[in-house]
């Protein structure tokens, strides 16, 4: 409902190459989270949507980005907490199209849902 108050395009699909932002309630290892991180997309807390909707406009993303604040009592290491911010900044600085740019990888796995997920992840993150 809150997204409808703001000018945006909501992508609900297995393909999300054109995504610019991902809203995540918590850090996780999902395909979408990993792909967004490796592609240098903004990964933001749900408060970004809530506060932007209350303001009636999109707010600056910086303070809502995962990795902006590192929690000491988190089940996730500081490296994991800071990964979205670090990768976004690194890819912006270097101009690389993704975290795995120029990697050549062979996946020796059976074809199933999990392999489909890895293939989509490689497509999104500049993996060859």
Predicted regions and their residues:
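Short, conserved beta-strand segments within well-ordered enzyme catalytic domains
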Residues: 23, 42-44
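The feature marks the first
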Residues: 1-13, 17-22
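Short, well-ordered secondary-structure micro-motifs within conserved domains or adaptor modules
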Residues: 16-29, 128
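Phospho-regulatory, Ser/Thr- and acidic-rich intrinsically disordered linkers and terminal tails
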Residues: 1-8, 31-34, 38-39, 46-128
């Amino acid at each position: 409902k809150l997204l409808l108050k703001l000018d945006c395009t909501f992508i609900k699909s297995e393909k999300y190459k054109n995504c610019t932002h991902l809203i995540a309630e918590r850090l996780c290892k999902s395909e979408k989270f990993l792909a967004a991180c490796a592609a240098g997309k903004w990964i933001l807390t749900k408060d970004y949507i809530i506060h932007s909707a209350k303001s009636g406009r999109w707010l600056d993303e910086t303070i809502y980005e995962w990795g902006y604040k590192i929690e000491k009592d988190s089940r996730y290491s500081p490296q994991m907490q800071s990964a979205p911010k670090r990768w976004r900044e690194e890819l912006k600085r270097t101009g690389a199209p993704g975290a795995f740019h120029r990697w050549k990888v062979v996946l020796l796995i059976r074809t199933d849902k999990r392999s489909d997920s890895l293939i989509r992840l490689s497509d999104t993150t500049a993996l060859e």
